[in-house]
């Protein structure tokens, strides 16, 4: 057992070191870039060391615990700890954020502020995944809003202010319900508010109150995940944001909603989750079909990829709603798989858009001839997104399928119907992705247009793409490497769930 404050260092280091960026000399962007990369690499190395040598995979309980009193007035503690549910998300955050800072090298306007905001997001995300106090969880949840809003509103397309405003309105609206739920759980049945997750797990509520709390939290998570019909901010945001910001949004921010749904709704409110789970499965199945169909009608290829993210989130919702070991592990695997694939697709879309200055599919064609490397990687990650066997997307969706089929919660006919709907969604996915590839890369429309910007990927971009492609293939070939992180904790969570 380690008493060293590893998690506090991981939470504080990025934002503290990031604040020193403003004191660096204003001689170009090179110093700021390398400094930010160094901070991200140092954070990731500390993270990897701490988890390799101080985290026991076979122990399903909370590890690396830290508990310090922060505010005496209402018993607010700085409580941190991790388990198998949060370990994968923290490693994903470190990996994607490090590569997103590398992707952001072309940013030259206000680069110091840009990199500081990325590091501030980094701290908030690590803090959220390692929080063991519900109020601290809420604070870290809200810490994301300001950096993301500024990243969206200051760097992006022509309608970036509109998309940033839409994002802040949606997420702030959901946060109101989150705060009401936090206060309701903290004040119920006690004269002194207590928000320790360990205590709240053993807290029981009247059925009506538990349903109201569950619904309030669900609205907040439905915005971030997103769940239809609270998803409309996502295509606008991804259509306008800089591609390094899109990597953080698709790779990590959406996963915060899924993590909250498991950590709070499923773990703390089991009775309500049991009642809501059929509706979650139905919503997830509808979301897969709806988002895939809508994606097919998008002219903007960035928005087409954004709707594909909404569709893939449907598998996570179904896995969480299945209430089985297999289904929940599949949902966690899909969280990690889509974190890699979604972030890379937006990076590729952004780099292609920077070169072509075009985003509408009918204006494109023949890009594979001047840019064969971008074409190869775009095709490879599109195959991963449509769940090609041997890649992480296939394993994650297959495990969710098995989780739903083996669920004792549902009868045979509903399971067959939901499985049929999911299968239709999986058929629609290659249709909209392959049609996008055909319109962008095949033909001769842009091949004869002289353009000095039509250059292929450089070493920096290829290094980034290969770094993400390796875990996508690795998880597809040997998924037990990732499943071993969460399987014991999921078993404990569901055993407690059924006993309640």
UniProtKB/Swiss-Prot annotation:
<feature type="transmembrane region" description="Helical">
    <location>
        <begin position="313"/>
        <end position="333"/>
    </location>
</feature>
<keyword id="KW-1133">Transmembrane helix</keyword>
<feature type="transmembrane region" description="Helical">
    <location>
        <begin position="111"/>
        <end position="131"/>
    </location>
</feature>
<dbReference type="GO" id="GO:0015990">
    <property type="term" value="P:electron transport coupled proton transport"/>
</dbReference>
<dbReference type="InterPro" id="IPR003918">
    <property type="entry name" value="NADH_UbQ_OxRdtase"/>
</dbReference>
<feature type="transmembrane region" description="Helical">
    <location>
        <begin position="167"/>
        <end position="187"/>
    </location>
</feature>
<protein>
    <recommendedName>
        <fullName>NAD(P)H-quinone oxidoreductase chain 4, chloroplastic</fullName>
        <ecNumber>7.1.1.-</ecNumber>
    </recommendedName>
</protein>
<keyword id="KW-0934">Plastid</keyword>
<keyword id="KW-0874">Quinone</keyword>
<feature type="transmembrane region" description="Helical">
    <location>
        <begin position="462"/>
        <end position="482"/>
    </location>
</feature>
<keyword id="KW-0520">NAD</keyword>
<dbReference type="InterPro" id="IPR022997">
    <property type="entry name" value="NADH_Q_OxRdtase_chain4"/>
</dbReference>
<feature type="transmembrane region" description="Helical">
    <location>
        <begin position="35"/>
        <end position="55"/>
    </location>
</feature>
<comment type="similarity">
    <text>Belongs to the complex I subunit 4 family.</text>
</comment>
<keyword id="KW-0472">Membrane</keyword>
<feature type="transmembrane region" description="Helical">
    <location>
        <begin position="334"/>
        <end position="354"/>
    </location>
</feature>
<feature type="transmembrane region" description="Helical">
    <location>
        <begin position="4"/>
        <end position="24"/>
    </location>
</feature>
<dbReference type="GO" id="GO:0008137">
    <property type="term" value="F:NADH dehydrogenase (ubiquinone) activity"/>
</dbReference>
<dbReference type="GO" id="GO:0042773">
    <property type="term" value="P:ATP synthesis coupled electron transport"/>
</dbReference>
<feature type="transmembrane region" description="Helical">
    <location>
        <begin position="386"/>
        <end position="406"/>
    </location>
</feature>
<dbReference type="InterPro" id="IPR010227">
    <property type="entry name" value="NADH_Q_OxRdtase_chainM/4"/>
</dbReference>
<keyword id="KW-0150">Chloroplast</keyword>
<keyword id="KW-0521">NADP</keyword>
<keyword id="KW-0793">Thylakoid</keyword>
<feature type="transmembrane region" description="Helical">
    <location>
        <begin position="417"/>
        <end position="437"/>
    </location>
</feature>
<keyword id="KW-0618">Plastoquinone</keyword>
<dbReference type="GO" id="GO:0048039">
    <property type="term" value="F:ubiquinone binding"/>
</dbReference>
<feature type="transmembrane region" description="Helical">
    <location>
        <begin position="211"/>
        <end position="231"/>
    </location>
</feature>
<dbReference type="Pfam" id="PF00361">
    <property type="entry name" value="Proton_antipo_M"/>
</dbReference>
<keyword id="KW-1278">Translocase</keyword>
<dbReference type="GO" id="GO:0009535">
    <property type="term" value="C:chloroplast thylakoid membrane"/>
</dbReference>
<feature type="transmembrane region" description="Helical">
    <location>
        <begin position="242"/>
        <end position="262"/>
    </location>
</feature>
<dbReference type="InterPro" id="IPR001750">
    <property type="entry name" value="ND/Mrp_TM"/>
</dbReference>
<keyword id="KW-0812">Transmembrane</keyword>
<feature type="transmembrane region" description="Helical">
    <location>
        <begin position="134"/>
        <end position="154"/>
    </location>
</feature>
<feature type="transmembrane region" description="Helical">
    <location>
        <begin position="87"/>
        <end position="107"/>
    </location>
</feature>
<feature type="transmembrane region" description="Helical">
    <location>
        <begin position="272"/>
        <end position="292"/>
    </location>
</feature>
């Amino acid at each position: 057992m380690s008493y060293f404050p590893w998690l506090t260092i991981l939470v504080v280091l990025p934002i503290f070191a990031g604040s020193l960026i403003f004191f660096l000399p204003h001689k170009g962007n090179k110093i700021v870039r390398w400094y930010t990369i160094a901070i991200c690499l140092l954070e990731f190395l500390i993270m990897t060391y701490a988890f390799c040598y101080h985290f026991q995979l076979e122990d399903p309980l909370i590890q690396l615990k830290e508990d310090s009193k922060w505010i005496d007035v209402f018993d607010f503690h700085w409580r941190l700890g991790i388990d198998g549910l949060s370990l994968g998300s923290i490693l994903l955050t470190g990996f994607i954020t490090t590569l997103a800072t590398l992707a952001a090298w072309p940013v030259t306007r206000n680069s110091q502020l840009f990199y500081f905001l990325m590091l501030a997001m980094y701290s908030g995300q690590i803090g959220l995944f390692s929080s063991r106090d519900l109020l601290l969880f809420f604070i870290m949840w809200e810490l994301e809003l300001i950096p993301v809003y500024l990243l969206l509103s200051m760097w992006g397309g022509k309608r970036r202010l509109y998309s940033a405003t839409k994002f802040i309105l949606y997420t702030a609206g959901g946060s109101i319900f989150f705060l009401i739920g936090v206060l309701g759980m903290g004040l119920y049945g006690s004269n002194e508010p207590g928000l320790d997750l360990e205590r709240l797990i053993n807290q029981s509520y009247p059925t009506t109150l538990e349903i109201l709390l569950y619904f309030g939290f669900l609205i907040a998570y439905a915005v971030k995940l997103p769940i239809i019909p609270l998803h409309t901010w996502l295509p606008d945001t991804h259509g306008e944001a800089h591609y390094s910001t899109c990597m953080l949004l698709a790779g990590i921010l959406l996963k915060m909603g899924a993590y909250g749904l498991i950590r709070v709704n499923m773990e703390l409110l089991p009775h309500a989750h049991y009642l809501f789970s059929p509706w979650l499965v139905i919503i997830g199945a509808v979301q897969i079909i709806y988002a895939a169909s809508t994606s097919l009608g998008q002219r903007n290829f960035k928005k087409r990829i954004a709707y594909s993210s909404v569709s893939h989130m449907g598998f996570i919702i179904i896995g969480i709603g299945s209430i089985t070991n297999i289904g929940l592990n599949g949902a966690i695997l899909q969280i990690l798989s889509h974190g890699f694939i979604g972030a890379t697709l937006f990076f590729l879309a952004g780099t292609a858009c920077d070169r072509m200055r075009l985003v509408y599919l009918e204006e494109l064609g023949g890009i594979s001839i001047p840019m064969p490397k971008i074409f190869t990687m775009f095709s490879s990650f599109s195959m991963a997104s449509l769940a090609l066997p041997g890649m992480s997307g296939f394993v994650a969706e297959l495990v969710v399928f098995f989780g739903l089929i083996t669920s004792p919660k549902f009868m045979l006919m509903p399971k067959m119907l939901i499985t049929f709907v999911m299968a239709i969604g999986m058929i629609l996915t290659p249709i909209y992705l392959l049609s996008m590839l055909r319109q962008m890369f095949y033909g001769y429309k842009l091949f004869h247009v002289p353009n000095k910007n039509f250059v292929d990927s450089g070493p920096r971009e290829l290094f980034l793409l290969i770094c993400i492609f390796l875990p996508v293939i690795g998880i597809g070939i040997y998924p037990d490497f990732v499943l071993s992180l969460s399987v014991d904790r999921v078993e404990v969570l569901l055993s407690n769930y059924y006993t309640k």
